[in-house]
Curated annotation (Swiss-Prot):
This is Myrmicitoxin(1)-Pr5a. Residues 26-37 form a propeptide. The modification Valine amide is found at V65. Toxin that causes a rapid and irreversible paralysis when intrathoracically injected into insects (blowflies). Does not cause spontaneous nocifensive behaviors by intraplantar injection in mice. Exhibits hemolytic and cytotoxic activities on HEK293 cells. The keyword Secreted applies. One of its GO terms (cellular component) is extracellular region. The keyword Signal applies. Residues 1-25 form the signal peptide. It comes from Pogonomyrmex rugosus (Desert harvester ant). Keywords: Amidation, Neurotoxin, Secreted, Signal, Toxin. Belongs to the formicidae venom clade 3 family. It is found in: Secreted. It comes from the Eukaryota. Its main location: secreted.
Length: 66
């Protein structure tokens, strides 16, 4: 159960970071191009880790709720 909460929390954090990056890209079109490459690599790594987890988390939530 604890791992479910951890996965869900990490997924939400990742989504919020991506939304923030998209909002910044809209308001400042050159912001992503000027972003620190290390930050972008960290985002890519987090994405690679979390994307396979998201469907599993969604299924577990469906099982708990319904």
């Amino acid at each position: 159960m604890r791992s479910l909460y951890l996965s869900f929390s990490l997924t939400i954090i990742f989504v919020l970071v991506i939304m923030h990056a998209e909002a910044k890209a809209i308001s400042e079109p050159n912001a992503i191009a000027e972003a620190d490459p290390r930050f972008l690599n960290i985002l890519k790594t987090i994405g690679k880790i979390l994307l396979p987890i998201i469907p599993t988390v969604a299924e577990k939530i469906k099982e708990k709720v319904g």
